[in-house]
């Protein structure tokens, strides 16, 4: 089941969802966004090699993305899980990479603000 799309002004990160999740604590928002950047980079790097635990890695990324409001990333990670099981993850992995890159750019922009 796809997650709700982010509001247009939020781009790849649903900032309202993030604010609700962090109870409006701006410092916590920045902290979880930074943690997501590190985790997403590590998981996407691992997924590129398609290790035996790739489906679990995609599921972990889906949950983390959902928590911060990166619903496109969550959707793409969710689509990767069955693609891995079906033995043809190439397209799904490329779409996940693109969604993560978009979220990363948005997060870096958010974190660059004072």
How should these model regions be labeled?
Residues 1-10, 114:
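Intrinsically disordered or compositionally simple regulatory linkers and C-terminal tails
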